[in-house]
Amino acid sequence: MILVTNDDGYNSYGIRVLYRAAASIAESYIVAPDHGRSATGMSTTYNVPLRAFKFDYGYAISGFPADSVYMARYALYNDKKIDLIVSGINHGDNISLRSLYSSGTIGATMAGALIGIKGIAFSMSYNGISNEKIDLAEPYIKAIIENAMERFPDDVDILNVNFPGNLNRNTRILPARMSYNIFDDNIIKRLDPNGHEYYWFGNKRHERCPENCDYDVVYRKNSISITPITVKGYLDDLRSTEEFISFINVKELLG
């Protein structure tokens, strides 16, 4: 089966289109948050109970996108084999390493990859996004899922797919490297009506991204980007760490 999830909530338009595409290929079910959970990464619920609310073709749950994956795998559909996780279609792109670590859309596929299930995260740029544009993405999504079910790259855990907002029937699909960071951050301090300070976190995008990075493909080339991701975020070569440890003198500190 194909598990369909997202971080915009089970009733978002994007997940409906994604489910429609997935269900045309294989048995598919939705397990997704009961409301928007954007920018929650791989957050997981540990200290409060989770609740699941059944509807025609899946469940809405009270947790995060990653919880949706765990609930599907270990509780709601534990009698079925999940062959692929598809997440989205997110309202807004998910490009750069910032999104890799903060996006709930990608976070759901990361949770799946860590328990051995490959996944695809689908997102669309805010620029020009509409239900009609999301509908236009459906044949592309169907083609990508069909291909993934047959020949998902062995050395890849997740495919991160981003659609331009002004998608059309002639839009190309291009491979893209993930840009390092496309945001310049800032914190704005203000006063509430009672004179107490509060803060807004914000950022602006910059265009310092090399050719063929995800930003370049989506925004400069007006194309669909597909970025391969692996969840292995560590180095096998321990030599530099061994050298670092050699300079730690604990005995001297302990006296």
Curated annotation (Swiss-Prot):
Pfam families per the UniProt record, alphabetical: SurE
Stored SUPFAM superfamilies: SurE-like
UniProt feature coiled coil, ranges: none
GO CC terms in record: cytoplasm
EC number: 3.1.3.5
Cofactor note: Binds 1 divalent metal cation per subunit.
Compartments, as annotated in UniProt: Cytoplasm
Reaction catalyzed: a ribonucleoside 5'-phosphate + H2O = a ribonucleoside + phosphate
Keyword Amino-acid biosynthesis recorded: no
UniProt protein name: 5'-nucleotidase SurE
Lineage: Archaea, Methanobacteriati, Thermoplasmatota, Thermoplasmata, Thermoplasmatales
Gene name for this UniProt entry: surE
